[in-house]
C-alpha cells in the first residue's frame, strides 16, 4: 500500500494540500475518461455554455469513476493522512467537473464546501481528493485555485467565532488570504486537499480544451459526530500529519 512520505505529510500540514504525480494507472484512467465521454454525450452542457459544468453521481453501484478511488492507490494515499483512522467516501458521491473554454473568469476569493441553504448543519468532510483527467500544465486553463495555508487560518477563525460561523458566513468565511496558487498537472495526477483549504473555480482562457477533473469528498469514519471540533482544530483527524509536524520541531 502506498503512503505519503514524511515530507509530503508535513507539506500537507503547512500548505493544506499535496499534488502527487502519475497515481492513477492508465487502464483505470482510460475507463474513467470513456465514462465521462458517455456522460457528456448523454447529458451535454447547454449550447454555448462556458465555464463550470458538473455531474454528480452515486458511488454505490461502483463503475469506472468510483474505481478511481476504490481500485487505485488513491485510497491508501488518502488513508495515510489520517492513519490509524479509516477513510470513506462522504455522501456516497463522486463529482465530474468540467471547465469549458473560453471562460474569462478570474477568481476573486475563496469558499468552503458544505453550506446548504436552510440547513442548520453544514455537510463538512475531512479532505477533497481530485483526479486530474486532462492536461492542466499551464495556468488559466480551467485550473482549480487554492489559497495555501488557509486550513490553519480557518481553524483560528472558527476557534474565535465558533463552528456555527461556517453556516453564518454561508461558506465564505472572511479571513485574510495569501496569494492563491493554481493546481497544475496532467492526467493521472491527484490532489489531496484539507477540507478547510480555501479554493475556487478558475478561468479557462489560456486553453482551447475542456478541463476535466473527478472529485471525491472523503471523510474519516465518525466525522459527522465531531465536525464542530474539526472546524476548530485543523489536525484533529490527521494523526499522521500531526506526528510528522511534531517530529520536524524536535
Label the predicted regions.
Residues 118-139, 184-187, 217-220:
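Short, conserved beta-strand element in jelly-roll/cupin
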Residues 1-14, 21-119:
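Non-heme Fe(II)-dependent double-stranded beta-helix
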Residues 25-26, 96, 136-138, 151-152, ...:
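Short, solvent-exposed loop/turn segments at secondary-structure junctions
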Residues 42, 50, 190-192, 196-250:
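Non-heme Fe(II)/2-oxoglutarate
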Residues 112-114, 131-135, 146-148:
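Short, structured patches in soluble enzyme cores that scaffold and shape functional sites
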Residues 99, 147-153, 211, 217-222:
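Short edge-strand/loop segments of extracellular domains
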Residues 106-114, 163-177, 208-210, 229-232:
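Short, surface-exposed loop/helix-turn segments at secondary-structure junctions
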Amino acid at each position: 500500500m502506498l503512503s505519503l512520505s514524511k515530507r509530503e505529510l508535513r507539506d500537507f500540514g503547512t500548505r493544506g494540500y499535496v499534488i502527487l504525480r502519475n497515481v492513477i494507472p492508465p487502464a483505470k484512467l482510460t475507463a474513467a475518461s470513456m465514462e465521462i465521454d458517455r456522460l457528456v454525450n448523454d447529458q451535454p452542457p447547454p449550447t454555448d455554455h462556458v465555464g463550470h459544468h458538473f455531474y454528480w453521481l452515486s458511488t454505490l453501484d461502483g463503475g469506472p469513476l468510483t474505481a478511481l478511488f476504490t481500485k487505485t492507490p488513491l485510497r491508501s494515499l488518502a488513508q495515510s493522512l489520517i492513519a490509524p483512522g479509516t477513510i470513506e467516501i462522504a455522501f456516497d458521491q463522486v463529482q465530474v467537473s468540467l471547465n469549458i473554454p473560453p471562460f474569462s473568469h478570474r477568481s476573486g476569493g475563496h469558499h468552503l464546501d458544505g453550506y446548504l441553504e436552510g440547513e442548520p448543519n453544514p455537510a463538512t468532510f475531512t479532505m477533497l481528493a481530485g483526479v486530474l483527467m486532462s492536461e492542466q500544465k499551464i495556468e488559466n486553463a480551467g485550473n482549480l485555485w487554492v489559497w495555501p495555508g488557509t486550513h490553519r487560518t480557518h481553524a483560528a477563525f472558527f476557534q474565535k467565532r465558533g463552528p456555527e460561523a461556517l453556516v453564518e458566513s454561508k461558506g465564505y468565511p472572511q479571513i485574510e488570504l495569501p496569494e492563491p496558487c493554481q493546481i497544475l498537472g496532467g492526467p493521472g495526477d491527484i490532489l489531496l486537499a484539507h477540507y478547510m483549504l480555501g479554493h475556487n473555480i478558475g478561468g479557462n482562457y489560456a486553453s482551447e480544451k475542456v478541463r476535466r477533473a473527478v472529485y471525491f469528498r472523503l471523510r474519516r469514519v465518525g466525522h459527522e459526530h465531531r465536525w464542530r471540533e474539526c472546524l476548530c482544530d485543523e489536525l484533529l483527524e490527521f494523526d499522521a500529519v500531526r506526528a510528522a509536524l511534531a517530529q520536524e520541531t524536535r
